[in-house]
């Protein structure tokens, strides 16, 4: 289920890694710890954010009101450190979900944690409600978040309706 999304991501990233490192990319990425895989996949799919992507910098970090980052001066190293810090923060936020915490952290990095956890104005997601009830069959709830600029990705809409 959820592994299908992860597998598709890993295959794309694997191809990129194999070209860069001159080795079998799939084998290379599977040798990485899960957190490192999440970092690689996030970098690959987020891409680099320049000034035109404000308030996002680096590999998709959203600048908070008290932060002073500039896309113009940010290095790849600084962005990598920031991405890892963000993912660790989200992993801690979802710690209660055990082995699903990294999956939820990467999703929260993309859609925001309150789209999952809820807030005063946003209800708690069905995905979180199912996990809290002990139901790990969350594939359809997970891919429901696969959209860009409010529109479902064409390759995902078929899976979501079937």
Show which residues each predicted segment covers.
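Early exported N-terminus immediately downstream of N-terminal targeting peptides
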Residues: 54-56, 61
């Amino acid at each position: 289920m959820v592994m299908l999304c992860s597998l598709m991501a890993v295959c794309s990233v694997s191809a990129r890694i194999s070209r860069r490192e001159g080795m079998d990319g799939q084998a290379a990425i599977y040798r990485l710890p899960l957190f490192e895989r999440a970092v690689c996949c996030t970098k690959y799919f987020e891409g680099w954010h320049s000034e035109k992507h404000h308030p996002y910098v680096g590999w998709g970090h959203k600048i908070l009101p008290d932060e002073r980052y500039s896309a113009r001066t940010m290095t790849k190293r600084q962005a990598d450190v920031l991405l890892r810090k963000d993912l660790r923060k989200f992993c801690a936020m979802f710690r209660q979900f055990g082995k699903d915490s990294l999956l939820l952290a990467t999703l929260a990095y993309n859609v925001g944690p309150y789209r999952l956890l809820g807030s005063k104005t946003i209800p708690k997601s069905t995905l979180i409600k199912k996990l809290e009830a002990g139901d790990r069959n969350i594939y359809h709830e997970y891919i429901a978040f696969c959209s860009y600029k409010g529109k479902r990705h064409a390759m995902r809409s078929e899976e979501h309706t079937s």
